Amino acid sequence: MGANVSQLEREIGSDLFPPNEHYFGLVNFGNTCYSNSVLQALYFCKPFREKVLEYKAKNKRPKETLLSCLADLFYSIATQKKKVGSIAPKKFITRLRKEKEEFDNYMQQDAHEFLNFLINHINEIILAERNAGPSNGNPKATNQGGSTSAMASSIASKSSSTSNSNSNSNSTTNSNGNSSNSTGSLNANTSVLDASGSLTATTTPIISGNGTGTNGANSEPTWVHEIFQGILTSETRCLNCETVSSKDENFFDLQVDVDQNTSITHCLRCFSNTETLCSDNKFKCDNCCSYQEAQKRMRVKKLPMILALHLKRFKYMEQFNRHIKVSHRVVFPLELRLFNTSDDAVNPDRLYDLTAVVIHCGSGPNRGHYISIVKSHGLWLLFDDDMVDKIEASTIEDFYGLTSDIHKSSETGYILFYQSRDCA
């Protein structure tokens, strides 16, 4: 290797370095580690990267949006002449701060809130461009499922062939009705408790265009839906008449509370524990025409291509009058299969591989730092803003959390990205 070869290239080795792959860190603009860590995780989610590069290829001169800026950033990384380096996502950050004023400052931001905003906002952009149709001067942009252009094919294959890859806001919500008949906001909280009442789970809202409406172009799902959207089914059994009713709800990610010395598998099992509705929380049974005691459970009906799991690491403590970090040890396996699926689940045996983890480093939501680890071609890499390092798979255990309940600074998994093996 020549004198200009980076340390990372030396560690990987010229023979083992993935062809046409690029490992580029992202420059931090004062407080943008929250976005850098999420962007790296998304870049190494194969289906997402391919669709963003495909969008770039189809839209030659698009109006500047957050999606076009993201596409430019991904394209810049994917077409670098060097294999390793760093790049400044200035255009993307500038646009982000214009789009959402909460990010237009130098305060500590929450990585999950950013992910939530980004995914929903990209979806809205796609829907808006689809509704605009050929009149926007970009007729190809309306084709979500067609073949890519030659440019798209070359870029996407270049990356895909080498890509095997707060506060803990309660604003995350579910649909307040049968999602199969709604394209509006999803705004009814879902709360599923285990036997001790200590573990809950919620889902990230799908702001609009859930792909099941009847209003023209909005009736077709976008590629954001195809990648991230799953379906939960809420099953409620009246204890008086035994009638079972169900309601479907879409989600882009699942949020789970964390408990000490547990695992993601345990958290997801508890997510589907049966909850008894009684006393002031009785269920209104349509068959009985009255409020009755009932049993309710939540199960997964459709497993998404990319399963994003948010560990709710920040909790408000009255005695401290502030949010504190919950650094409990939660094991997240390299392989994951969901067992809390419904009887009519579309793909109940789907097997997932851990692709990326956004990690929070620090002692609370208003202080600390975000980094990410990603899997690429069998290699594990750590991205810390503009720095990129190769790590061993065993290092992942360092980010499970602490076995002690003492509140102190820690480096813990915060957002997990699991990619379905059938789309690898």
UniProtKB/Swiss-Prot annotation:
- Chain intervals for the UniProt region annotation (Disordered): 131-189
Q: Name one GO biological process term.
A: protein deubiquitination
- What are this entry's molecular-function GO terms? cysteine-type deubiquitinase activity; deubiquitinase activity
Q: Which domain of life is it from?
A: Eukaryota
Knockout phenotype, as recorded, reads: Viable but sterile with reduced lifespan. Severe defects in adult intestinal epithelium; increased number of intestinal stem and progenitor cells in the adult midgut. Conditional RNAi-mediated knockdown in the central region of the notum results in notum malformation and disorganized thoracic bristle socket pattern with socket duplications or loss of bristles.
Per UniProt, which keywords does this protein have?
Hydrolase, Protease
PROSITE patterns linked to this entry:
USP_2, USP_3
Q: Which EC numbers does the record give?
A: 3.4.19.12
Q: What class of enzyme is it?
A: hydrolase
Where is this chain compositionally biased, Polar residues type? 133-144
Can you list the GO cellular component terms from the UniProt entry? cytosol; nucleus; peptidase complex
List, for all copies, the residue spans of the domain called USP. Answer: 24-421
Q: Which reaction does it catalyse?
A: Thiol-dependent hydrolysis of ester, thioester, amide, peptide and isopeptide bonds formed by the C-terminal Gly of ubiquitin (a 76-residue protein attached to proteins as an intracellular targeting signal)
Q: Where is the composition biased (Low complexity)?
A: 145-189
Q: Which InterPro entries match?
A: Papain-like_cys_pep_sf, Peptidase_C19, Peptidase_C19_UCH, USP_CS, USP_dom
The residues annotated as the active site are: C33, H369
Q: How does it assemble?
A: Catalytic component of the Usp12-46 deubiquitylase complex consisting of Usp12-46, Wdr20 and Uaf1. The Usp12-46 deubiquitylase complex associates with arr/arrow; the interaction leads to deubiquitination and stabilization of arr/arrow.
Q: Which family does it belong to?
A: Belongs to the peptidase C19 family.
The UniProt entry, under PANTHER family, shows: RE52890P, UBIQUITIN CARBOXYL-TERMINAL HYDROLASE
What function does the entry list? Catalytic component of the Usp12-46 deubiquitylase complex. Deubiquitylates the wg/wingless-signaling receptor arr/arrow, which stabilizes the receptor and increases its concentration at the cell surface; this enhances the sensitivity of cells to wg/wingless-signal stimulation. This increases the amplitude and spatial range of the signaling response to the wg/wingless morphogen gradient, facilitating the precise, concentration-dependent regulation of its target genes.
Q: What is this protein called?
A: Ubiquitin carboxyl-terminal hydrolase 12/46 homolog
Please spell out the taxonomic lineage of the organism that makes this protein: Eukaryota, Metazoa, Ecdysozoa, Arthropoda, Hexapoda
Record gene name:
Usp12-46
